[in-house]
C-alpha cells in the first residue's frame, strides 16, 4: 500500500509538514542539512518505530520539544485510507496507532509498512558482521512467515536464560530441559530462514548479475552450526566449551548469509559504487519476492541517490525501480541527479531548512 499523505511534527529540523504523495516516485531535493534525509528517517520511524541514524529518541525530537509525531495514510487495494501514526516522547514513551486504535505494537507497524532502505551507510550489509545479514534474512522471513516473530523472540529469551545458567550449572543435566525447547525453536527458525533464502536466491543473483554483469555472484546460507548435526546434540557436545566461555557459541543467533564474488569475499573485490549496486540488487530482490509471496508492495527509501554511482549506474537502478511499480522516496542534492527517474506521475519536493514544499 502506498503512502498517500505524510504528516511530520517536531522531528529533527522539521517543525511541521503535511504533504500529499505520489504512489510512484517522490523526490526530495535540497542542499546538505536541509532536512531531506529527515523526511526519509521519519518514514522509516513510521514503519520500524526507530530511526536508522540514531538509537537515541532524544536526538530526533526537535530541540526544546518534548515529543514528536509522524502520521501517514495508506491507500489499500479498495482505495480505502488507513491511518497509522507514532508518537515518541523524550522519556522513551512510545504510542502506536493503526486505524485509529491505540496500543498497537511496533511489529504491527512493520507489517503494515514494509520498507527497504538504501543509504550511504548501507554497505554494512556486505562488509560488516553477520548480524546485518541475519537482519536482512529475518526481514523477509518476518513478512512471509507469521509465526517467525514470536518463535525468534522465544528463542532469544531462552538463549539468555541458558547463558545465565551456564555460570552456575554443575552438569549438563541442569540445562537439558531448557535445551529441548531451545533446540526445537532453533530447528524451526533455521528451516524458515533456509527456505526463504532458497526462494529469493535466484532473483537476488539474477539482479546482481544485471547490475554487475562482469562478476559471478554467489549467495549461501549458513545456519549457525554444523549442517548435518541436530542442534540439541550440538548444545550437549559443546556444554563444557560454552560454560568456559560463558555463552552459547553456536545457534541461529550466529547464522549468516555468505556472499561471494568470483569465489572471493565481496569487500575484497568490489568498489564502493559496485557495493552500492549489489545492496540495491539485494533490496530489490527482497521487495519483488515479498510481492510475489504476499501481494504487498515495499516502499523504497533511497537516501543520497547519486552517491557512489555514475550516470549509467543511476539509470540502471532507476529503470529497475520503475519496473517494480512500487512507491519510492529519493533524496538528492540537485534535480539533474534524478533526471532518469522523473516522469509525469512523480512529485518533487524542495526542502530548505526543514520546510518542505511541492515543486
From Swiss-Prot:
Binding annotation for ATP: 30-37
Entry's Gene Ontology cellular component terms: cytoplasm
One GO BP annotation of this record: DNA synthesis involved in DNA repair
Family recorded in the similarity comment: Belongs to the RecF family.
Subcellular location: Cytoplasm
Organism, scientific name: Vibrio vulnificus (strain YJ016)
Domain of life: Bacteria
Function of the molecule: The RecF protein is involved in DNA metabolism; it is required for DNA replication and normal SOS inducibility. RecF binds preferentially to single-stranded, linear DNA. It also seems to bind ATP.
SUPFAM superfamilies: P-loop containing nucleoside triphosphate hydrolases (SSF52540)
The protein's name: DNA replication and repair protein RecF
Gene3D superfamilies linked to this entry: P-loop containing nucleotide triphosphate hydrolases (3.40.50.300), RecF/RecN/SMC, N-terminal domain (1.20.1050.90)
Keyword list, A-Z: ATP-binding, Cytoplasm, DNA damage, DNA repair, DNA replication, DNA-binding, Nucleotide-binding, SOS response
GO molecular function: ATP binding; single-stranded DNA binding
Chief localisation class: cytoplasm
Amino acid at each position: 500500500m502506498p503512502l498517500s499523505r505524510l504528516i511530520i511534527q517536531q522531528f529533527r529540523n522539521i517543525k511541521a509538514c503535511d504533504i500529499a504523495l505520489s504512489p510512484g516516485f517522490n523526490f526530495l531535493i535540497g542542499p546538505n542539512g536541509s532536512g531531506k534525509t529527515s523526511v526519509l528517517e521519519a518514514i522509516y520511524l513510521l514503519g520500524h518505530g526507530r530511526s536508522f541514524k540514531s538509537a537515541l529518541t532524544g536526538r530526533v525530537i526537535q530541540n526544546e520539544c518534548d515529543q514528536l509525531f509522524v502520521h501517514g495514510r495508506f491507500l489499500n487495494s479498495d482505495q480505502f485510507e488507513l491511518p497509522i501514526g507514532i508518537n515518541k516522547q523524550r522519556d522513551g514513551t512510545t504510542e502506536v496507532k493503526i486505524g485509529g486504535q491505540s496500543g498497537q505494537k511496533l511489529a504491527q507497524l512493520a507489517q503494515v509498512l514494509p520498507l527497504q532502505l538504501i543509504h550511504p551507510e548501507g554497505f554494512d550489509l556486505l562488509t560488516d558482521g553477520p548480524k546485518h545479514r541475519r537482519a536482512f534474512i529475518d526481514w523477509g522471513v518476518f513478512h512471509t512467515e507469521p509465526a517467525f516473530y514470536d518463535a525468534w523472540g522465544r528463542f532469544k529469551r531462552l538463549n539468555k536464560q541458558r547463558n545465565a545458567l551456564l555460570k552456575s550449572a554443575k552438569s549438563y543435566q541442569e540445562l537439558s530441559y531448557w535445551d529441548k525447547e531451545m533446540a526445537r525453536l532453533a530447528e524451526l527458525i533455521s528451516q524458515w530462514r533456509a527456505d526463504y533464502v532458497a526462494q529469493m536466491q535466484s532473483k537476488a543473483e539474477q539482479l546482481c548479475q544485471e547490475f554487475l554483469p562482469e562478476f559471478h555472484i554467489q549467495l549461501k546460507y549458513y545456519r549457525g552450526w554444523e549442517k548435518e548435526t541436530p542442534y540439541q546434540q550440538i548444545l550437549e557436545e559443546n556444554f563444557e566449551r560454552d560454560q568456559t566461555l560463558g555463552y552459547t557459541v553456536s545457534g541461529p543467533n550466529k547464522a549468516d548469509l555468505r556472499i561471494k564474488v568470483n569465489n572471493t569475499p565481496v569487500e575484497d573485490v568490489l568498489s564502493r559504487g559496485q557495493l552500492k549496486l549489489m545492496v540495491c540488487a539485494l533490496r530489490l530482490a527482497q521487495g519483488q519476492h515479498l510481492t510475489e509471496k504476499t501481494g504487498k508492495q515495499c516502499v523504497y527509501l533511497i537516501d543520497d541517490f547519486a552517491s557512489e554511482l555514475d550516470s549509467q549506474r543511476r539509470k540502471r537502478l532507476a529503470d529497475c525501480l520503475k519496473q517494480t511499480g512500487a512507491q519510492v522516496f529519493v533524496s538528492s542534492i540537485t534535480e539533474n541527479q534524478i533526471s532518469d527517474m522523473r516522469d509525469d506521475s512523480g512529485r518533487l519536493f524542495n526542502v530548505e531548512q526543514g520546510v518542505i514544499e511541492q515543486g
